[in-house]
Swiss-Prot record:
Highest taxon of source: Eukaryota
Stretch list, region Disordered: 1-80, 96-120, 390-422, 457-498, 549-576
InterPro entries listed in its UniProt record: GM130_C, GOLGA_cons_dom, Golgin_A
Recorded family membership: Belongs to the GOLGA8 family.
Protein name: Golgin subfamily A member 8C
Length: 597
């Protein structure tokens, strides 16, 4: 594009230049040219290029029409040449100026052309953008038209539905007005009936609340009594613990004194062994060839006596060590026997746990508690016997240890035999700790078991609170219970009532199972008492809940099928009086007044 404009401009400039030369240089005749050749003016005509000024043309024309003289021709030639040269210079200058102007115009035109091209490109880009925007607007317009059509159709459908819904609403309002009238009549009839029923329920709940308050006061009183007994038992335990600690301190002091004596005897034995080795070394040395002096017989006898004395002391020490080793072996065997007995007792406890789990029934809970109470008493006696035996055995080795160092001259020698007595004392201390742990574990288990068995009838879902009313031997049987079952439940109620006669014994057993820092298992916490007062969940307890399933359970877990339960059942048959009043927990005492009518 720029090249074409440039070429067109150059062509236009060439045309203008040709026109200018044509205007300034008219045509010269051929005769004049020949005359110039003859006159020797070929060079000037060549330089002029056929371009002559008007003066030259007039002179040539005058020379052609009227011949002149040679002198005049020579004078005219240099004037014409200088004029031509000046004219040519002027034309060259003007041409240079025109050339510069033309070049300047070309540059300006180039710049304008470049700007024009840039503007055209920007316009093309804008046109493309506008076309793209136009396409987008067209698509948006198409979508908006479609959406408008869709919304118009939906509005029509909604208008139709609105009409139908208004019609339906009118129908429903008419039906509702008819239904409300009937409902009001029914509500008036029902309110009159429900008011009387609610009043009756309110009176019944007030009665139950009064009963619960009375029971709560009784439970609080029993809780205070049990807490006092627990504090007394805790003080008793503290005194026993202090006595045991004093005995252990005495034992430790005696052990320290024995250790000191043992060290002293060991040092004496070492000194005797050194002296004996020196004497043997002196006796084994060969006599010098020339002894300076022969020892006397008195000195030799003295040395022999000293040697015999040292040998006797060593022999006594060896015998003493053997006796101590035998004693340690005997004590170890006794400790093994005691450990085996403890293991047997633990196995018995496990068997009793399994037996109690198998015999866990709500109707026979009090009998099982009696059996457990017997086993607890037996275990307490066994524990007391073990404690007495341990005390005797702990006192016996100390006395023997105090007597033996006085009787024997030498002390126990080095080795494993001398440390057997200390090991024996440590094993006995561990055994006493083990016995205490077993006592605490069994007490805790028995406490949890009593809590579980007494609260089991409360939480069992099969029974109702109205079916159970033991007290004074009278009982109202439920719909699925016969007269014999009612009498059995009444006997159980009598057993609960008779538990008050053995209040001290049962309370002492319950408090013996609780450490000083733990609350009694049967005494409910303040939160539990508050919950019972608010909700009335524990207002009544059924002791005759579904007797037939319970009998089925007794068949499945009968003591005849399980040999571990036979001794307890046999003991209960031999002592029938204990089944009604020996092991009633203290939290059952508040129940009989509530159940009596």
């Amino acid at each position: 594009m720029a090249e074409e404009t440039r070429q067109s401009k150059l062509a236009a400039a060439k045309r203008k230049l040709k026109e200018y030369w044509q205007r300034n240089s008219p045509g010269v005749p051929a005769g004049a040219k020949r005359n110039r050749k003859t006159n020797g003016s070929i060079h000037e005509t060549a330089t002029s290029g056929g371009c002559h000024s008007p003066g030259d043309s007039s002179s040539t024309s005058s020379s052609l029409h009227a011949p002149q003289s040679p002198c005049q021709e020579l004078a005219v030639v240099p004037d014409s040449r200088s004029v031509k040269v000046s004219q040519l210079k002027n034309t060259i200058k003007s041409l240079k100026q025109q050339k510069k102007q033309v070049e300047h115009q070309l540059e300006e035109e180039k710049k304008a052309n470049n700007e024009k091209q840039k503007a055209e490109r920007g316009l093309e880009v804008q046109i493309q953008r506008l076309n793209i925007q136009k396409g987008k607007l067209n698509t948006d317009l198409y979508h908006t038209k479609r959406s408008l059509r869709y919304f118009e159709e939906e509005s029509k459908d909604l208008a139709v539905r609105l009409q139908h819904s208004l019609q339906r609403k009118g129908e429903l309002e008419r039906a509702l007005s008819a239904v409300t009238a009937t409902q009001k009549k029914k509500a008036e009839r029902f309110s009159s009936r429900s008011k009387a029923r609610m009043e009756w329920k309110l009176e019944q709940s007030m009665r139950e609340q009064a009963l619960l308050k009375a029971q709560l006061t009784q439970l609080k009183e029993s809780l205070k009594e049990v807490q006092l007994e627990r504090d007394e038992y805790a003080e008793h335990l503290k005194g026993e613990r202090a006595r045991w600690q004093q005995r252990m301190r005495k034992m430790s002091q005696e052990v320290c004194s024995l250790k000191k004596e043992k060290k002293h005897d060991k040092y004496r034995v070492e000194t005797l062994e050194r002296s004996l080795s020196k004497l043997k070394h002196q006796m084994a040395e060969p006599l010098p060839p020339e002894p300076p002096a022969v020892p006397s017989e008195v000195e030799l006898q003295h040395l022999r006596k000293e040697l015999e004395r040292v040998a006797g002391a060593l022999q006594a020490q060896v015998e003493y060590n053997q006796r101590i080793s035998l004693l340690n072996e005997g004590q170890k065997e006794r400790l093994r026997e005691q450990e085996e007995r403890l293991q047997e007792q633990q196995e018995r406890l496990r068997e009793q746990e399994e037996r109690l789990q198998q015999l866990a029934e709500p109707q026979n809970s009090f009998k099982e508690l009696n059996n457990e109470n017997k086993s607890v008493l037996q275990l307490e006696q066994q524990v007391k016997e073990l404690q007495e035996k341990l005390g005797k055995r702990l006192a016996h080795p100390v006395a023997s240890a105090q007597k033996e160092p006085e009787a024997a001259v030498p002390a126990p020698g080095p080795g494993g035999e001398s440390s057997g007595f200390m090991d024996h004392l440590e094993e006995k201390a561990d055994l006493s700790e083990l016995v205490e742990k077993e006592e605490l574990g069994f007490f805790q288990y028995y406490r949890e078991r009593c809590h579980q068995k007494v609260y089991h009838p409360i939480t069992k879902p099969g029974g109702s609170a109205k079916d159970a009313a033991p007290g004074g031997g009278h009982h109202q049987a439920g719909p699925g219970q016969g007269g014999d079952e009612g009498e059995a439940a009444g006997a159980a109620g009598d057993g609960v009532a008779a538990g008050g006669d053995y209040k001290g014994h049962s309370k002492f057993l319950v408090t013996a199972q609780n450490p000083a820092h733990e609350p009694s298992p049967g005494a409910p916490a303040p939160q539990e008492l508050g919950a019972a007062h608010k909700h009335g969940d524990l207002c009544e307890v059924s002791l005759t809940d579904s007797v037939e399933p319970v009998q089925g359970e007794t068949r499945e877990g009968s003591p005849h099928d399980k040999p571990t339960a036979q001794p307890i059942v046999q003991d209960h048959q031999e002592h029938p009086g204990l089944g009604s009043n020996c092991c009633v927990p203290f939290f059952c005492w508040a129940w009989p007044p509530r159940r009596r009518r």
